[in-house]
A protein has these predicted regions:
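Membrane-embedded multi-pass helical conduit in multi-pass membrane proteins
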Residues: 228-287
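Short beta-strand/loop segment that forms part of the nucleotide-sugar
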Residues: 33-43, 64-65
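Short, well-formed alpha-helical segments that are part of the catalytic scaffolds
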Residues: 13-28
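Catalytic donor/gating beta->alpha subdomain of glycosyltransferases that bind UDP-sugars
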Residues: 167-226
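A conserved acidic beta->alpha catalytic loop
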Residues: 41-50, 99-100
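Cell-envelope/extracellular polymer assembly enzymes that use nucleotide-activated donors
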Residues: 3-5, 36
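Acceptor/aglycone-binding surface of glycosyltransferases and processive sugar-polymer synthases
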Residues: 66-68, 72-82, 94, 100-177, ...
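Short acidic donor-binding loop at the edge of a beta-strand
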Residues: 86-91
Length: 287
């Protein structure tokens, strides 16, 4: 019998999480195995209120309460580190708590993970449900990160894989910055599945221009070496073609600013302590 861990980061989103758990309970019906949910509570200010009475297909729900708010990407890092520490062989699935990751598509990811044990199965976002402005901003982010890194990163947290892959996932601390970038950097075998991104269950999207810029910076700093090489060759090529002193100086300054900024951001924000120490306490709310 297979064991499954469903990892969900959450911050003040308990109403949505209740609906997600209800849908997950339906979605995994008929799948042979034991399903356990780990919720990483990112230091929510609202009182935890989860309804677990009718979740017959979910055997256990555990909440990891964090000492401070650190963001969903770092919360996922801690959740995966916790699973790695308890050394429990399983299939791990990751979803956001807001409902944008369709729980009824989870079975599709799990089935692929069962067949391809050495692969990380990720959900490529084939369609997004945000307004036109946010879709446009996200498109610019995709183009910008592709231009700088050479990587097309069109997936988020929604994924599934065997726990044996955690060793290569944690080859370094790249996952601390951004889950998708860390996976793409550390794992060669990635299976992409096209899945439509759904609307949030409740409330407005938290994504805005500031969020996208911050997230893009976290992604590109993971590929700092690739950025250095690509930008160096691009600047060199332009200098050789145009041979304009003023343009050359501007390009060199831009090259230095870009690479120094990326490197500095990585060094300042890099993990230099045991992330599991950020767990305040653990609480079982369903056994």
């Amino acid at each position: 019998m297979n064991n499954f861990f469903i990892l969900i980061p959450s911050f003040n989103d308990w109403v949505s999480l209740n609906k997600l758990l209800f849908h997950l309970n339906k979605a995994v019906q008929g799948v042979e195995g034991k399903f356990k949910v780990i919720v990483v509570n990112d230091c929510s200010t609202e009182k935890i209120n989860l309804k677990t009475k009718n979740l017959k297909n979910i055997k256990n729900i555990k909440i990891l309460n964090l000492k401070k708010n650190i963001g969903s990407q770092k919360a996922i890092f801690i959740g995966l580190k916790y699973i790695q520490k308890i050394n429990y062989k399983s299939i791990i699935a990751i979803l956001d708590s807001d409902g944008e990751d369709n729980p009824f598509k989870l079975k599709k990811l799990i089935n692929l993970a069962l067949k391809k044990k050495k692969f990380i199965v990720v959900a490529d976002r084939s369609k997004r449900m945000e307004n036109i402005f946010l879709r446009f901003l996200n498109y610019l982010r995709l183009i910008g990160t592709f231009f700088l890194t050479g990587k097309y990163i069109n997936f988020g947290n929604f994924s599934a894989f065997y726990s044996t892959n955690l060793k290569k996932i944690f080859l370094n601390n790249n996952l601390w910055f951004a889950y998708s970038a860390g996976i793409l950097k550390n794992c060669k075998k990635i299976e992409r599945v096209s899945i439509e991104k759904k609307k949030r269950y409740y409330g407005a999207s938290k994504v805005n221009l500031t969020f996208l810029l911050s997230h893009s910076l976290k992604i590109i700093c993971v590929f700092k070496k690739e950025i250095f090489v690509r930008s160096f060759f691009a600047v060199t090529l332009i200098i050789l073609i145009f041979k304009n002193l003023v343009l050359d100086i501007k390009l060199i300054v831009l090259f230095l600013i870009l690479n120094i900024s990326v490197y500095a951001y990585y060094q300042i924000n890099n993990l230099n302590f045991d992330a599991l120490k950020l767990i305040k306490n653990k609480k079982n709310i369903k056994n």
